[in-house]
């Protein structure tokens, strides 16, 4: 085995040096890529933590809102129950007052004729009974008697008295 010629050794050394440079360059690029990947992984991990924390906070906020809405619903349902009870009570009162209202309406409709009747009765009361000297001979002792003709055994007739009590 003979020694290789010096040119071949120089070329081989140059080639080895180029391979070493390329290997060092690739290792540096690999290191840079690994650093970049680690940095991205850390950023993604932080971002995931932030998103997870935000999601947890949203869940808690949703739960608080649901609890508040449930409380509001219970309060509203209690108010509805109370109002329904008040309506039932008022309906019952209206049912009790309705016949009286109808009676009052009937009285109001009949008031003018009753007022006329009361005025006539007051006039009759003002006139009073006839004096005994003005009576017709052979007639009853009092011209205004309470006799209906059905009281055959009754010898005594009661005089009519006009009153305005209603």
Swiss-Prot record:
GO terms for cellular component: cytoplasm; type III intermediate filament. Keywords: Coiled coil, Cytoplasm. It comes from the Eukaryota. The keyword Cell inner membrane does not apply. It is found in: Cytoplasm. Residues 7-89 form a coiled coil. This is Vimentin-type intermediate filament-associated coiled-coil protein.
